[in-house]
C-alpha cells in the first residue's frame, strides 16, 4: 500500500497518482505556547490528528497528505523568543504559489487543515484567490479548534482568556505525543 504522505513517495509514484485525489495541506505555526509546551505544539497537534485519521481509515485511498507548512504567519507572537513567522502578504503568496502549482498539474481538490488561529484569515484570502485563478477547484478549510460543541469542553474561564497554550491545547498535545508538559511550571 502506498504511503498516505506525499513526501514519502517517489517522483514516479506521484506521477501515477490519480488527479482526483484529495490533497490535505496542513498549516501550523512555530510559536510560544506558554512555558510548558514546545514551540512546535501546533504541528504536533496536527500530526496527531492526521495519524489518528490514517489509523481510523486505513483503506481510504482518496486522499494524500502534503508536507506541513509549519512556519506560518504568527506576528502576534513575535515578541516571544522562538517564534518563526512570515509576514501576512508573503505567507498568502506562498500558499497561492504552492497550491497554484498543484492546480497546474491538474489537482483540483484540497483540504486546508489549520492549527493556528492567527492565520484563519490568511487561508480564507488564499483560497479565494486560488479559486478565482484556477477554475473548478474545491477547497475545504478546516480548523481543528473550531468544531461543533467546542465551547462545551473548554472551561469557561479559559474561554474568557483564550485557550492558546491553556488546558485545551495542553491536553491535546499531551494526549497525542505522550510528552509531559513541563511540570515545574504547572506545579505538579
What is each of the regions a protein language model found here?
Residues 1-111, 117-180:
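Extended, histidine- and acidic-residue-enriched regions that form the cofactor-binding/catalytic faces
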Residues 178, 185-188:
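Single conserved hydrophobic/aromatic residue that forms the stacking wall/gate
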